[in-house]
Amino acid sequence: MLTEDDKQLIQHVWEKVLEHQEDFGAEALERMFIVYPSTKTYFPHFDLHHDSEQIRHHGKKVVGALGDAVKHIDNLSATLSELSNLHAYNLRVDPVNFKLLSHCFQVVLGAHLGREYTPQVQVAYDKFLAAVSAVLAEKYR
């Protein structure tokens, strides 16, 4: 459960993420493909090389969806419903992959925000991304 303090931290840090959406999203995807190579199977048509236009574009979409979740942090289910449908029914992505990408995104935040990525911010983002992952996995039940 996100506290009001968590929500404030998430929104404050998100202002910094907005300046680097494509870069942070692409880096998180690249990290996921390296650390969890099985995730590449969902992107057979992508050029998976560093800095590929396809990865940058998809990374921007991922971070854009997270931005929508930040804007509507109190209504994640409705905000992410279409995305959940897409991943569950069309793409059939194993829900564990949402957690893997969440972890990689947190690594990117920590690497780029440095001292601003405090333990409190990390806990808030961990809870937020877990909530997003849970909502994206709702349609699988």
From Swiss-Prot:
Domain Globin stretches: 1-141
Signal peptide segment: none
One GO cellular component, as annotated: hemoglobin complex
Keywords: Heme, Iron, Metal-binding, Oxygen transport, Transport
Pfam assignment, any one: Globin
Residues bound to O2: H58
Biological process, per Gene Ontology: hydrogen peroxide catabolic process
Membrane-crossing segments per the record: none
Binding of heme b, residues: H87
Expressed in which tissues: Red blood cells.
GO MF annotations in UniProt: haptoglobin binding; heme binding; metal ion binding; organic acid binding; oxygen binding; oxygen carrier activity; peroxidase activity
Functional note: Involved in oxygen transport from the lung to the various peripheral tissues.
Family: Belongs to the globin family.
Note: Hemoglobin A is the major, and hemoglobin D the minor hemoglobin of this species.
Assembly notes: Tetramer of two alpha chains and two beta chains.
Annotated protein name in UniProt: Hemoglobin D subunit alpha
Originating species: Aldabrachelys gigantea
High-level lineage: Eukaryota, Metazoa, Chordata, Craniata, Vertebrata
